[in-house]
Amino acid sequence: MSRNNEELQGISLLGNQKTQYPTGYAPEILEAFDNKHPDNDYFVKFVCPEFTSLCPMTGQPDFATIYIRYIPHIKMVESKSLKLYLFSFRNHGDFHEDCVNIIMKDLIALMDPKYIEVFGEFTPRGGIAIHPFANYGKAGTEFETLARKRLFEHDAQ
């Protein structure tokens, strides 16, 4: 069952050959589309191996693989807009932990998922690797319980 034009309203970046790459943090670039299967609970996983941001103290680049897993509700994130959004961190100065939490909060604001987790596997600097993990489960649902459980067990992956 293909999507019709009405279902694709608001998706402007996918297939656009005149892509504009943001030069600064750009949450407004994120686009969403309707989940055709809101009655099914299923995971969507993105692996983003080319994430870069800047150290807020030194201005040096930080590199990471960002893992995003979510259980959609009504809306889902469009992947090209996600790619451009993550690219917008390239000149953004923030700590690793901040980047992961900002990404999660922006995706919650966009999609209102049942559950989401964002994990950053940052390349070691100064001999230390930082791997922040943030998650969220919709309040008052079984996903709130899942989020709490995953928070304490995420390193057992």
UniProtKB/Swiss-Prot annotation:
Entry's Gene Ontology molecular function annotations: preQ1 synthase activity
Example GO CC term: the record gives:
cytosol
Name the pathway it acts in.
tRNA modification; tRNA-queuosine biosynthesis
Q: Which SUPFAM superfamilies match?
A: Tetrahydrobiopterin biosynthesis enzymes-like (SSF55620)
EC number(s) on record? 1.7.1.13
Reactions catalysed according to its record: 7-aminomethyl-7-carbaguanine + 2 NADP(+) = 7-cyano-7-deazaguanine + 2 NADPH + 3 H(+)
> Which positions in this protein are listed as binding substrate?
77-79, 96-97
Principal localisation: cytoplasm
Q: Locate the active site.
A: 55 (thioimide intermediate), 62 (proton donor)
| UniProt enzyme class | oxidoreductase
Annotated GO biological processes are: queuosine biosynthetic process; tRNA modification
Its domain of life reads Bacteria
Instruction: Report the locations given in the UniProt record.
Output: Cytoplasm
Keyword vocabulary terms for this entry:
Cytoplasm, NADP, Oxidoreductase, Queuosine biosynthesis
Q: Say which family it is in.
A: Belongs to the GTP cyclohydrolase I family. QueF type 1 subfamily.
Function text = Catalyzes the NADPH-dependent reduction of 7-cyano-7-deazaguanine (preQ0) to 7-aminomethyl-7-deazaguanine (preQ1).
- This chain's protein is named NADPH-dependent 7-cyano-7-deazaguanine reductase
Origin species, per record, is: Neisseria meningitidis serogroup B (strain ATCC BAA-335 / MC58)
Native organism taxonomy: Bacteria, Pseudomonadati, Pseudomonadota, Betaproteobacteria, Neisseriales
